[in-house]
């Protein structure tokens, strides 16, 4: 019996590879060297176009891919970890402005800025805590026998998040757009 999703469902694995190669051909697939057996894609995107930031991204499959077991799994079964720039660093830089804007940490949390940026969540990765892009509410992620959210679709949503986040960071959009949630 195969333990990992890509062994037990080689057709899904091939579909994932085909989608990424079609839409994000510069990304490469590898296996984490932490003993977990998890696969990940790594590459760079610049969704804001020339002159915008280039983002180095890892898309990390959970071993449960494509099955989402609860409505609390933000980001679904493909976690999106920006390596450069690092979200935690950006969030730490933004936190004084967030506190100035919202007055208290509790008020910042109430408005969705508890971590310093909209639509991110924290999780352990290796030996440190990292901030991941939350591309959609978990209830919108697909994960059953007939359909699932792919790395390519998760990265597409992440690119939209990056554009909106860059606009917000540059002052080109307000908090209400950043918190809209319809990424």
Question: Residues of each region from the PLM?
Answer:
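UBC/E2-like fold recognition across ubiquitin and ubiquitin-like conjugation systems
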Residues: 1-183
